């Protein structure tokens, strides 16, 4: 049993110090943070001055250094998600960012503006839905990983034992991490999605849980973070675990998703779908092998399901992925290419059964994790399906939900919830819960990476592709286009700041946020708008003859269209690009 973190806290604020008081039964600890020296110490309740301003909080997210100095980030609101084997799981829904400094008079105007921008970045990340924590249970590990731990591991604090891939406030907690005596004040926070449901089939009640854990390594937004880095971390890597708890028995099925693990990019350039660029100079095999070496160590066998198009702009990526798997020649890897869009065109989504039939035997070999009511491990999951499309969102989520249902069918039959021959699809009440949960999971993962809800969720929710779903996909695609081109640079900077990929240095002579714009950035859009406006005016206010009107319309029309294509040609100069961290530029 891990050493629990404190659940009930009070924050006492004085001009000199922050005091975080533990209010759990029998607790006398007070975490003290000096607002001048930034020193963190442990005190007792009698050390809190009665003059302090007091407020309840629900956890410490951590501290961060900005231009104005240090800031303390605390959780101010939470909602209960459910109970996980008698452990309460919470979603953090509101935060407060508190400055150590009492005044900003020591800052110049430029520093004040930069500090304001950095605070806006912090708040942007905090406002993204999907931060979860528990004060008594380790949410960062799967059931199978937790079952294979030593007694020493189980005695560690939640912070010490957490899987660092999924601790999104790891950088913010670095000061508390260095002092084991204050670990009970430190909450490892997960980013992703968690839902819990009490369900009933055949009069038998069981808990069904879905957890998606987003990796904080190579984290970012859709078009600015693709492929892998030099350490083998894949973009948009998510570990998804489905858990069943029935009569003391526990079963789980784990899947992963992650960007195609080679060095490639797809930077926005105002085009609806920028061309993917595969690096011609990077050592793809080195990064590829690093990625899968770590995946095999953590999860075992890898069944790779590549769902991207096998023609057009996506074809080179599919060929590269297949070549890499073949060249590595590992017996721990199986590669399956399934052209999702080709197979399911004309809304023939029933054809997904082709893929499910193809991998059925492999899924049976991989199995799932099962512990009986006596605590004995009955079955281990021997590997995972690693699914991907271009974004690892829409197509990926559809396939994962179908694979998870097949595993759940086997688990519930083995546990005696389903009768022999009974199909999960026939259990209408549970099916509704199941489909909606997986659609909600898709939306959460999509919003965190692409900025909008997922596409194709009408199929996940209903089992059918609908015309309304197509319209909603079109709307979400338009929103994605706007965000990817005109706001994702800020979103990427926000994530890099939050995760510590960029550290603020107030002594920097040049502000990283100040990026001079080329003359084209202002001049060309103005010319295009003026030319288009003149074209409309000429149409509305006809000249003396139709030839004169036509000449004016043609002139201004050609000017506006020509300017538009010049802007499109120079698209990368017009998009909102990250400013804090330069990712590998390989295009």
UniProtKB/Swiss-Prot annotation:
Q: Does the keyword Cell membrane apply?
A: no
Tissue occurrence: Detected in heart, brain, lung, liver, kidney, pancreas and testis.
Family matches, as Pfam families:
Syja_N
Which residues point to the Cytoplasmic side? 1-520, 570-587
Q: Which positions carry the signal peptide feature in this UniProt record? A: none
Where does the record place the modification N6-acetyllysine?
A: 456
SAC domain boundaries:
122-451
Report the EC code(s) recorded for this entry. 3.1.3.64
GO molecular function terms here? phosphatase activity; phosphatidylinositol phosphate 4-phosphatase activity; phosphatidylinositol-3-phosphate phosphatase activity; phosphatidylinositol-4-phosphate phosphatase activity
Q: Quote the catalytic activity from the record.
A: a 1,2-diacyl-sn-glycero-3-phospho-(1D-myo-inositol-3-phosphate) + H2O = a 1,2-diacyl-sn-glycero-3-phospho-(1D-myo-inositol) + phosphate; a 1,2-diacyl-sn-glycero-3-phospho-(1D-myo-inositol 4-phosphate) + H2O = a 1,2-diacyl-sn-glycero-3-phospho-(1D-myo-inositol) + phosphate
Its assembly, as annotated, is: Interacts with TMEM39A. Interacts with SEC23A and SEC24A; this interaction is reduced in the absence of TMEM39A. Interacts with PLEKHA3 and VAPA and/or VAPB to form a ternary complex.
Q: What does this protein do?
A: Phosphoinositide phosphatase which catalyzes the hydrolysis of phosphatidylinositol 4-phosphate (PtdIns(4)P). Can also catalyze the hydrolysis of phosphatidylinositol 3-phosphate (PtdIns(3)P) and has low activity towards phosphatidylinositol-3,5-bisphosphate (PtdIns(3,5)P2). Shows a very robust PtdIns(4)P phosphatase activity when it binds PtdIns(4)P in a 'cis' configuration in the cellular environment, with much less activity seen when it binds PtdIns(4)P in 'trans' configuration.
Q: What is this protein called?
A: Phosphatidylinositol-3-phosphatase SAC1
């Amino acid at each position: 049993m891990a050493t629990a973190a404190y659940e009930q806290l009070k924050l006492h604020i004085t001009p000199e110090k922050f005091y975080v008081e533990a209010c759990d039964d029998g607790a006398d600890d007070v975490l003290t943070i000096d607002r001048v020296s930034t020193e963190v110490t442990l005190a007792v309740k009698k050390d809190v001055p009665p003059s302090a301003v007091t407020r309840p909080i629900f956890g410490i997210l951590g501290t961060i250094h900005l231009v104005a100095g240090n800031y303390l980030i605390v959780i101010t609101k939470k909602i209960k998600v459910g109970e996980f084997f008698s452990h309460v799981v919470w979603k953090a829904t509101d935060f407060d960012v508190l400055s150590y400094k009492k005044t900003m008079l020591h800052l110049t105007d430029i520093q004040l503006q930069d500090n304001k921008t950095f605070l806006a970045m912090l708040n942007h990340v905090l406002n993204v839905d999907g931060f979860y924590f528990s004060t008594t249970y380790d949410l960062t590990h799967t059931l199978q990983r937790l079952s294979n731990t030593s007694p020493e591991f189980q005695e560690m604090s939640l912070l010490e034992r957490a899987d660092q891939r999924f601790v999104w406030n790891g950088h913010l907690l670095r000061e508390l991490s260095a002092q084991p005596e204050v670990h009970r004040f430190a909450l490892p926070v997960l980013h992703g999605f968690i839902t819990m449901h009490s369900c009933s089939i055949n009069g038998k009640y069981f808990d069904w849980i879905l957890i998606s854990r987003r990796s904080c390594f190579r984290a970012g937004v859709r078009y600015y973070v693709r492929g892998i880095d030099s350490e083998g971390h894949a973009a948009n890597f998510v570990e998804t675990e489905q858990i069943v708890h029935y009569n003391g028995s526990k079963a789980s099925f784990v899947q992963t998703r992650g960007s195609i693990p080679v060095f490639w990019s797809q930077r926005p350039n105002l085009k609806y779908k920028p061309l993917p660029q595969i690096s011609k100079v990077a050592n793809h095999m080195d990064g590829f092998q690093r990625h899968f070496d770590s995946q095999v160590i953590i999860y075992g066998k890898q069944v790779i399901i590549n769902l991207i198009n096998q023609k057009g702009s996506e074809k080179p990526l599919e060929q590269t992925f297949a070549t890499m798997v073949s060249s590595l020649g590992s017996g721990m890897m199986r590669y399956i290419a399934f052209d999702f869009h080709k197979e399911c065109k004309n809304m023939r989504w029933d054809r997904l059964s082709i893929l499910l039939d193809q991998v059925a035997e492999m899924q049976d070999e991989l199995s799932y994790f099962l512990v009986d009511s006596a605590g004995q491990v009955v079955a281990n999951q021997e590997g995972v399906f690693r699914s991907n499309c271009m974004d690892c969102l829409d197509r990926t989520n559809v396939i994962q939900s179908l694979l998870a249902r097949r595993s759940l069918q086997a688990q519930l039959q083995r546990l005696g919830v389903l009768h022999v021959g009974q199909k999960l699809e026939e259990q209408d009440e549970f099916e509704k819960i199941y489909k909606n949960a997986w659609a909600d999971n898709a939306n959460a993962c999509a919003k965190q990476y692409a900025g909008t809800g997922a596409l194709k969720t009408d199929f996940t929710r209903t089992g059918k592709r609908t015309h309304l779903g197509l319209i909603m996909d079109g709307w979400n695609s338009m929103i994605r286009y706007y965000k990817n081109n005109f706001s994702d640079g800020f979103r990427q900077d926000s994530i890099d700041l939050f995760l510590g990929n960029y550290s603020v240095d107030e002594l920097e002579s040049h502000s990283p946020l100040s990026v001079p714009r080329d003359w084209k950035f202002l001049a060309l859009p103005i010319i295009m708008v003026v030319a288009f406006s003149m074209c409309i005016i000429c149409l509305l206010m006809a000249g003396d003859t139709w030839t004169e009107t036509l000449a004016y319309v043609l002139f201004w029309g050609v000017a506006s269209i020509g300017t538009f294509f010049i802007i499109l040609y120079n698209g990368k100069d017009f998009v909102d690009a990250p400013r804090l961290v330069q990712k590998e530029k390989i295009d």
